[in-house]
Amino acid sequence: MNLTILRTKTALEDWCRQKHNHEINFVPTMGGLHQGHQELIKTARSFCKRKHSSQVLVSIFINPLQFDLEEDFKKYPRTFENDCKIAYEAGANAIWAPSFESVFPNGEEAHFKIQVPFSLNKYLCGASREGHFDGVATVVVRLLALVRPNRIFLGEKDWQQLVILRQLINDLGLPVLIHSIPTKRDQDGLPCSSRNVNLSKEERKKVVALPAVLQQAAQAFQENKPINLNNMKTTLEEHDLKVEYLETVDLKNLNPVNHDESKLCLLAAAVHCGNTRLIDHGFLMKRNPIVAIDGPAGAGKSTVTKKFAQKLGLIYLDTGAMYRAVTWLIQENNIDPQNSSELELILNDINLDICLSNTGNQQVLINGKDITTLIRSPTVTSQVSLVAAIGSVREKLTSQQKELGSKGGLVAEGRDIGTAVFPDAELKIFLTATAQERAKRRAIDLKKQGFSTPSLSELEKQIKERDRLDSSREIAPLSKAKDAQELITDGMNIEEVVELLINIFREKIPQEVWPTNAT
C-alpha cells in the first residue's frame, strides 16, 4: 500500500515542501472512516484528475475540544489501520495523524480559540452542545494553518457545522475553497456516521424511522401538501426515539423559519436511540433553483454561465441573445426602432424560439431561421443597447423569459435578471471586470468569430459607451441587485471563475438538492 503516513508537524511540513508545486485537496476527519468519508476522498481525488499536480491529504485527528463529555471522547472509534485502508482505496496520497501536542504545542491554553457567533450556535445542535462548535472551529482553523490546502472537502450531513465553517473561512479570508458532498446513506436510509456502530440491531430497526419521516416530509412539501412537525415528532416517539429537536431553519443563517412561507429551508432533527445520539435532515424545496447572473458587456458572462450551467446541469438562458435577435430582425427589415407602429407590427409577428439545454448551448431562431451566429456581429452589437432600452421590446422579452424560467432549474444571464426578470432567484451574481480587461476579451471573441477587430483603445471606448447606455436607460437599467454578490474577474481564468461560482452556489443550494455534474 503506497500511502504516506505523517505523524508529526515536521513530517507534514516536509511533505508539503516536497509537494510545493502541487495543489493540496484536504479531507479532515476524526477517523472511524465510513462510506461518507470515502465519498469525500473520491471527490477530492476527482479534482486531481482535472489538475494532474494535485494531492489528496486526509487527516485523522480525534478532536477533544468538540466533545461534551470525556466518556464520549474515550468511546469514539479508533480504527487506524482500517482507516488507512479505506483512505488509500478511495484515492488518498497521504494520511496525517498528528498527536494533540503536534496540533497544539504546549497545550490548548497556549493558543487562540475561536468563538462561533451566537446567531449560528443558538439553534439545532448548538443549543444543547455548549462549546462543541467552538471546538470544531478552533481545530479546523489550526489544521488549515498547518496544511494550507487549496481545497477542503466537507460533508453536508453536519449541515450546521458546514455553515459555520463556511462563514469562518469567509470571515477570516482564508485562501481555501470549500467543496461539499451530499449525505451518504446506508441501504436502510440511515446517514453514514461513525456513531452507527454503537447501535444494536434492535435500535437500528427503530432509528430508521428518522430518515423515513424526513424524506416523507420533503416529498409532501414538494407536492404542496401540509407538513405538521408535531405529528412527525409523535411518529418518531412511537418508534421509541427521544427527540432532542425537530426544526425548520434558514439554510444560511440557521434561524427558525415558517416552512409554509419558505421556498427552500432545512428540516433538521436530532434523536436519541438508547445511548446513541444521531442527527439527520432533509431539504424542503418548492421549485428548482434559479441563478441570475448580471453584469456589463464583455465581462465574460456568456462563457462563464455556459460552463457553470454544464457543471450544475442547469438550463442556460442567454437573455442578451434574445435582445440581439430582435435587433438583428429590426436591421434586417430596415426598421427605425424609434418608429413605434412599425416596431409593434414586427413584435406582434415575431416568432422567437430559444432552444434551451443543460449542455451550455443555446440556439436562437427567428421565424424558423437559425441566427445564432449572425446576432454576434459588430453591427448588431453596436445597436443592441438602443433596442434593449425600448419599453415594448423589454416587456415582450421579459414576459417570455419569465415563462421559460417558471419551473426553475435555470441559470440566466443578462443586464436585469436579478432586478427585473427573476427577482426571487436563489442566487444573484453581478459579474464584472475593468473596461481594459473586457476590451481584451472582446478582441479575442471577435477574432474567433472571424470578424474584423478594432484597436483595443477603440474597443474600450465602445465598451464604456455601452456601459453608459445600459446604466442610464429609463427602463430596467443595468444595476446590481441589492442581494447580489459582486465578482470582479480581472486576472482570473474561466475555470477559476466557474469554480468560485459553484462554491457560492453551494452556500445557497446543497448538493442533496441539486447535485454537481460529474463532468
Swiss-Prot record:
Please list the reactions this protein catalyses.
Answer: (R)-pantoate + beta-alanine + ATP = (R)-pantothenate + AMP + diphosphate + H(+); CMP + ATP = CDP + ADP; dCMP + ATP = dCDP + ADP
Task: Say yes or no: keyword Hydrolase present.
Answer: no
Out of the domains of life, which is the source?
Answer: Bacteria
Q: Where in the cell is it found?
A: Cytoplasm
Q: Which GO terms describe its molecular function?
A: ATP binding; CMP kinase activity; dCMP kinase activity; pantoate-beta-alanine ligase activity
One Gene Ontology CC term in the entry: cytosol
**EC numbers for this chain:** 6.3.2.1, 2.7.4.25
Does the keyword section mention Nucleotide-binding? yes
Amino acids binding ATP: 30-37, 155-158, 192-195
Q: Which InterPro entries match?
A: Cytidylate_kin, Cytidylate_kinase_dom, P-loop_NTPase, Pantoate_ligase, Pantoate_ligase/cytidylate_kin, Pantoate_ligase_C, Rossmann-like_a/b/a_fold
Annotated metabolic or biological route of this protein: Cofactor biosynthesis; (R)-pantothenate biosynthesis; (R)-pantothenate from (R)-pantoate and beta-alanine: step 1/1
Q: Which UniProt keywords apply?
A: ATP-binding, Cytoplasm, Kinase, Ligase, Multifunctional enzyme, Nucleotide-binding, Pantothenate biosynthesis, Transferase
- Family annotation (Pfam families): Cytidylate_kin (PF02224), Pantoate_ligase (PF02569)
Could you name the active-site residues? H37
Residues annotated for beta-alanine binding in this entry: Q66
General function of this protein: Catalyzes the condensation of pantoate with beta-alanine in an ATP-dependent reaction via a pantoyl-adenylate intermediate. Catalyzes the transfer of a phosphate group from ATP to either CMP or dCMP to form CDP or dCDP and ADP, respectively.
NCBIfam families per the UniProt record, alphabetical: cmk (TIGR00017), panC (TIGR00018), PRK13477.1 (NF010004)
Q: Can you name this protein?
A: Bifunctional pantoate ligase/cytidylate kinase
Q: Which organism is it from?
A: Prochlorococcus marinus (strain SARG / CCMP1375 / SS120)
